[in-house]
Amino acid sequence: GADGAAQVLRAKHIVLATGARARQLPQLPGDGKTVWTYREALTPPALPKRLLIVGAGAIGIEFASFYRAVGAEVTVVEMAPRIPPLEDEDISAQVAASLKQDGIQVHTQVALEQATRAGDAWQLTLRQQGGPQGTLQLQADVVLVAAGIVGNVEDLGLDKTRVQVEKTHIVTDAQCRTAEPGVYAIGDVAGPPWLAHKASHEGVMCVEHIAGLHPHAL
């Protein structure tokens, strides 16, 4: 409660919708000033001259396109062989070509090895994966970490239930049910795709299932 006292709530059905947060990289602890997550990227105090984005999923590519359109020099680095990494190869090829046509530098199959702040700039060392081995040196004024998100599964007491957690996300079936009867999980905490309309549909589907209806699964 508001006074700090513990409360015990009981329910026949429980829906977990605790969301997720940006994944942090040990080499780039977020400070909100020169190392951003998607939250800081939405409300920047000023336009960075050089922006480097780590991760080429939906979030990384969206911000790359936006910041390039408003005048920033943008570089995108990704560990996977192509971007976006989870799309079909022909779609990835079109996206990569479009980004390069807009003047966005794209580096795939590279892993962040080291990051140091020197004066007003970040110096990043990336290890090339596959093909010719070596390192790549890049500089940026601001680094946006878009390397995925982590489900908010802590402090929920899940260890006392049959709810399963894999890769920081709650495991559910097609009706958003967990392994614990009566406990559901929806939205970002239930894993990808991390999209608002997916979470909204899951919420409706989950409640309809609880009400005894037979909603269509995703």
Q: Regions from the language model: what does each represent?
A:
Residues G1-H13, V106, E113-Q123, N152:
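Feature captures the FAD/FMN-dependent oxidoreductase FAD-binding
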Residues G4-H13, P132-V142, A179-E180:
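Core beta-strand elements of the Rossmann-like FAD/NAD(P) dinucleotide-binding domain
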Residues A5-V8, T18-A22, V95-V106:
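Helical element adjacent to the flavin cofactor pocket in flavoenzyme catalytic cores
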Residues V15, W36, T75-V77, H107, ...:
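Hydrophobic/aromatic beta-strand patches that form the interior of the parallel beta-sheet core
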Residues T18-E73, V77, D102, D159-T161, ...:
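Glycine-rich dinucleotide-binding loop and its adjacent helix/turn
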Residues G19-A20, Q128-G130, L144, G148-I149:
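Short glycine-/small-residue-rich Rossmann-like dinucleotide-binding loops
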Residues D31-L47, Q137-L138, V142-H214:
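FAD-site-proximal beta/loop scaffold in flavoenzymes
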Residues L42-T43, P48-L52, A58-Q128, Q133-L136, ...:
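Rossmann-like dinucleotide-binding cores of NAD(P)H-dependent redox enzymes
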